[in-house]
Amino acid sequence: MPDIAPSSQPEGDLRYRRVILKLSGESLAESGKRGISDNELLAIAKQIKSAHESGCQIAIVNGGGNILRGASFSGANASVQEATAHYMGMLATVINSLALQDALDSIGLQTRVMSALPVDRVAEQFIRRRAIRHLEKGRVIILSGGIGSPFVTTDTAAAQRALEIEADVILKATRVDGVYSDDPEKNPHAVLYEQLSYNEVIQKKLRVMDATAIALCNEHRKPILVFNFKQDGNIVRAVRGESVGTWIGDPQDTQTNQR
């Protein structure tokens, strides 16, 4: 599939046929809070439905930080081994996936939750061919449990699954407008980047995804679009290839496919 930077398209055009939508666990909670907010769930679900109705096949990878973040939990609880804490974090992603599934179902989408961990009473086992088949049948799939191994972030899981299902792009949903030179909430002079190469992300130590995820995307030329999902309609704009957020990809494509 082509690795090209998005450009402005007439309304209704679809730039990306199949995407991985990476949601943080915190995106399901109210700002600054933990747990799951019904209002946040439905707001995200409605945006996903609009993007799906445009013809895009959508696979979602969500985090679990609104419930439990493995690395930080083990640091604060000496009696819990780090590997165990990571498995607990994976189970948190399953909880989030079930909540998101019901929200999507409630507004008329067909969904499947697939898990890298065996939880067959509530989710299917992740099998690559089955996942692709669900997408081809018009279902939204929610991929939980990371990749089923500790010490691997859900960012890396998103990169891995994007390669497996041959997604055109990873859409990383955040609460800010893209990738900045510094934390925009702390530094009002932080600069928003329109486009970056993978190497620039690494060299500038920009907080986009973890190093393993960036390395995977770099090696396989899988582009990433970082955008603000809190702005209504941005998920649809992203799948159409409109100028939204920060595009990260191969330097050649970044230079020759200006938005």
Curated annotation (Swiss-Prot):
Record keywords, A-Z: ATP-binding, Cytoplasm, Kinase, Nucleotide-binding, Pyrimidine biosynthesis, Transferase
Chain segments annotated as transmembrane: none
GO cellular component terms attached to this protein's record: cytoplasm
Chief location: cytoplasm
EC number: 2.7.4.22
Gene Ontology terms for molecular function: ATP binding; UMP kinase activity
Residues holding ATP: 22-25, 65, 69, 174, 180, 183
Full protein name: Uridylate kinase
Naturally occurring in which organism (per UniProt): Rhodopirellula baltica (strain DSM 10527 / NCIMB 13988 / SH1)
Gene: pyrH
